[in-house]
UniProtKB/Swiss-Prot annotation:
Native organism taxonomy: Eukaryota, Metazoa, Chordata, Craniata, Vertebrata
Active site positions, chain numbering: 226, 334, 383
This protein's name: Palmitoleoyl-protein carboxylesterase notum1'
Entry keyword set: Glycoprotein, Hydrolase, Secreted, Serine esterase, Signal, Wnt signaling pathway
Location(s), subcellular: Secreted
Similarity annotation: Belongs to the pectinacetylesterase family. Notum subfamily.
Catalyzed reaction equations: [Wnt protein]-O-(9Z)-hexadecenoyl-L-serine + H2O = [Wnt protein]-L-serine + (9Z)-hexadecenoate + H(+)
Glycosylation site list: 90
A matching Pfam family: PAE
Length: 488
């Protein structure tokens, strides 16, 4: 019965596709061949060229999505939701403690798209705080307790309703066990006590994947969150260069950096670096880059004096030097940025100087993203998003993050590649303009630190000591209208 249903659905899909092409011919008097028809080695799930049907795109995509979701159970027995752990063959490339580095892989036979994800998890910058990290967060420094398989969510999910454009790609998850923002190339020494080989781990994983199907890939998307997002910026061009050197120049490499775009701004409250969490970003990276023996891209390194390579860890400084296309996802009020700036929102009420600092942080971050061609920056108080199951719900100006990524993907395909203009109705440079945290109604929920209860935007602002009368006056609005806007 199930087999008959699947065959029927497949026939229906082909009927719609053929019927659609006939309709397109009548409307446009020409057919743009689909990438199915152009590709030589097999295609993706639904890699159609919709250029001729921009007017009916939403209806057609809804039909395709519905059919994809209906067909998904047909292949459920063949698709394994779990990613399997593989230890690196090259045992000299290790985690901090000398245990073998590795990666989790879910293969998707027939797909020529690969998503390689770099996990995040802060860093350590001295023997002392690395020892503490090893005692309290050992899985971020050692592979000895990694499970043999794992499942993932968000852009790593195999469910089309949760991951509409990447669910059928080959998915690779590289656990973070180098504590060096994916930048180190240093083996374990007696002085350091640990190995820092983040960049080398990425290189070894890519080399091994060539023997597992990456050699026939069309696209490799190097993605990462938090420290992994910064790792994307540091390594995306290296991966592209590596593949070219190994004889695979036809594999296009792109980057997706989530919550890894930090500012080296002045802290709200200055502290020394005894606590790694509240250490100023610039000082932390300056110390870390020496301890890790970090490698930064040569094009970025050349922009700064010797000894100032730490600048390349900050997105707005390295981005102009990158050759590979990169999409930047960044909360305007990132919790990790606020933490290193010593802004503690759990305390109430927030002083006016702190409130102004928070608003200014949003403005500064927005300014650093204005020249980034592909970006998604909601005015929310959060950290990381692309591996969250709710990642499809966040919107900026009515466009969701998966949709923005899809539009970016389309813009990089022929014949759109050389166009400087975004495709009509398909934006991928999206930033909120409202000036305070959680002013975007699609932001993830905030919870009270003490009660655990969800808070509305108004409750959250009141919790911070928000002066409704004063803020309404600043915005030129009546207090009641301001609260109405915040509540909607």
């Amino acid at each position: 019965m199930a087999g008959t249903l699947c065959v029927t659905l497949l026939l229906l899909l082909s009927t719609i596709a053929v019927g659609g092409r006939k309709t397109w011919r009548r409307r446009s008097q020409q057919i743009v061949p689909s990438s199915w028809e152009r590709s030589e080695g097999g295609g993706e799930s639904f890699p159609l060229d919709f250029t001729a049907v921009e007017g009916n795109m939403d209806n057609f995509m809804n039909q395709i999505k519905s059919l994809a979701q209906s067909l998904y159970p047909c292949s459920a027995q063949r698709l394994d939701d779990e990613m399997k752990l593989h230890s690196l063959h090259n045992k000299s490339v290790t985690c901090n403690d000398g245990s073998p580095a590795g990666y989790y892989l879910k293969e998707s036979k027939g797909s020529r798209r690969w998503l390689v994800f770099l996990e995040g998890g802060w860093y350590c910058i001295s023997r002392e705080n690395c020892d503490i990290r090893y005692d309290t967060m050992r899985s971020l420094m050692s592979s000895r307790a990694w499970p043999p398989s794992k499942t993932a969510s968000g852009i790593l999910s195999t469910q089309p309703e949760e991951n509409p454009h990447w669910w059928n790609a080959n998915i690779v998850f590289i656990p973070y066990c180098s504590s060096d923002v994916w930048s180190g190339v240093s083996p374990k020494t007696e002085k350091s006590g640990y190995a820092f080989m983040g960049s080398l781990i990425i290189q070894e994983v890519v080399k091994e994947l060539l023997g597992k199907g990456l050699d026939t890939a069309k696209l490799l998307l190097l993605a990462g969150s938090s420290a992994g997002g910064t790792g994307v910026l540091l390594n995306v061009d290296m991966v592209a260069n590596l593949l070219e050197e190994l004889g695979y120049p036809g594999i296009e490499v792109r980057g997706l950096s989530d919550s890894g775009w930090f500012l080296n701004n002045k802290q709200y409250w200055r502290t020394d670096c005894t606590d790694i969490i509240t250490c100023a970003p610039t000082e932390a990276i300056q110390r870390g880059i020496r301890y890790w023996n970090s490698m930064v891209p040569e094009r970025c390194k050349q922009q700064f004096k010797e000894g100032e390579e730490w600048n390349c860890f900050f997105g707005y400084k390295i981005y102009p030097t990158l050759r590979s296309p990169v999409f930047v996802v960044q909360w305007l009020f990132d919790e990790a940025q606020l933490t290193v700036d010593n802004v503690h929102l759990s305390r109430q009420p927030v002083q006016e100087s702190q409130w102004l600092y928070i608003q200014n942080l949003g403005r500064e971050l927005r300014n650093t993203l204005k020249d980034v061609g592909a970006s998604f920056a909601p005015a929310c108080l959060a950290h990381e998003v692309i591996t969250r199951s709710h990642w499809t719900e966040i919107q900026v100006r009515g466009t969701s993050l998966p949709r923005a990524l899809h539009c970016w993907d389309r813009s990089l395909q022929e014949p759109n590649k050389n166009s400087k203009v975004q495709l009509k109705g398909c934006p991928f440079h999206l930033m909120d303009s409202c000036p305070w945290p959680q002013c975007n109604p699609t932001c993830p929920s905030i919870r009270d630190h003490f009660t655990g209860q969800e808070m509305s935007v108004v409750q959250f602002l009141m919790h911070l000591g928000f002066d409704v009368q004063k803020m309404a006056s600043q915005q030129g609005m009546e207090p009641g209208k301001l609260l109405g806007v915040l509540s909607s």
